[in-house]
Amino acid sequence: MKKKVLKHCVILGILGTCLAGIGTGIKVDAATYYGNGLYCNKEKCWVDWNQAKGEIGKIIVNGWVNHGPWAPRR
């Protein structure tokens, strides 16, 4: 029984080492976050609209609350 378990552990270890060396081939580009869902790297800029929707909604609500029709006029 112990020999079977040891044999399986060795086989799985060798298989895991081989598969780990293959890699996924996914490249990750470092990007800078500028707020409101805007990201830029050396090549391009893009918007994460899922994040931007929430941020833009906050801006609209805060603007309405602070400067709505009830706000004093100058």
Swiss-Prot record:
Its GO biological process annotations read:
defense response to Gram-positive bacterium; killing of cells of another organism
Offer one Pfam family short name for this entry: Bacteriocin_II
Q: Which domain of life is it from?
A: Bacteria
Q: Where is the signal peptide?
A: 1-30
User: Which keywords describe this protein according to UniProt?
Assistant: Antibiotic, Antimicrobial, Bacteriocin, Secreted, Signal
Q: Does the entry feature the keyword Transport, yes or no?
A: no
Task: Summarize the protein's role.
Answer: Bacteriocin with antibacterial activity against the Gram-positive Listeria, Enterococcus, Propionibacterium, Staphylococcus and some strains of Clostridium, Lactobacillus and Pediococcus. Lacks antibacterial activity against Gram-negative bacteria.
Q: What is this protein called?
A: Bacteriocin hiracin-JM79
Which organism encodes this protein? Enterococcus hirae
Q: Which gene encodes it?
A: hirJM79
